[in-house]
Amino acid sequence: MPPPRSSAAPTLAELRRLTESAGGSAGAAGPDAAPTLPFGVAGLDAALPGGGLALGALHQIHEGGPRGRYAATAVLFAGGILARLDGPVLWCLHSRDLFAPALARVGLHPDRVVYCETWRDAEVLPAMEEGLRHRGLAGVVGELTRMALTPSRRLQLAAEGSGVTALVVHRLCAGEAAEPEPSAARTRWRVAPAPPEGIDRRMDRRLGRPRWRLELQRCRGGAPGGWIVEACDAQGRLAIPAVLADRPAAPERVLRRAVR
């Protein structure tokens, strides 16, 4: 859950001061083309216009499984993206299950995060829109169960106007269909843990980072696709898993086989 408030933690009253020091007050973005944030995974970046995730735009991230089971994976994917951007982050949520130390493990330090706690989706959306007016933010995250087309258009326009990236992490409710509604988001992602293939599960956990099944379901001007990637590291970076089956056996293993 979000850390308890203390004198050291940023408050909403300090948000304007933080954003002004990071990049100025709210206002329209310049006429230059929107920058992108490459993931560093060749096939993934090739599917995205400009070779990376468009900044100053709205993106949707869905948990790829039954309600609540993979919500943490979607949150960590969002955290890894924002970890590689400069400035504070406004995180709008209406449930208290966000685990701040987990965000730190993907590179997003809790000191960078300003939490906006609400009671329902209807309060998350205006909080996000307000945050997107502040150009010094690295990004604005909103945890929502549903988002209709009209609110998504408002968020997309606000992101375009300020150049601040907006991420909506969808949290499924009981009885809700997993199929997403139409929206104005630039991309729509679905992320879930990927079970290991061809090796023992316990060995897979010892050999490196967890694996995710990452799907780009919709991309304006790009190509949908799916990838198995290693989860974000301490700098928020994804990676392609090593192909263990193609590695030569270790010398000790070869020697043991020869003795037998």
Where are these regions (language model features)?
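Glycine-rich, charge-decorated loop segments at or immediately adjacent to ligand/cofactor-binding or catalytic sites
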Residues: F99-L103, A174-A192
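C-terminal functional extensions of proteins
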Residues: R188-R260
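Short gly/pro/ser/thr-enriched loop/turn and capping motifs at secondary-structure boundaries
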Residues: A122, C173-A178, G198
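Hydrophobic/aromatic beta-strand patches that form the interior of the parallel beta-sheet core
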Residues: H59, L90, V114-C116, L167, ...
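Detector for small/aliphatic-rich hydrophobic stretches
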Residues: M1-W91, P110, Q217-G222, A239-R260
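Conserved nucleotide-cofactor-binding alpha/beta core module
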Residues: P88-E143, L149-R153, L157-S162, R171-L172
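A short secondary-structure junction signal
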Residues: T150-R154, A178-P182, G226-I228
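Short, structured patches in soluble enzyme cores that scaffold and shape functional sites
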Residues: E143-T145, V168-R171, P193, R218
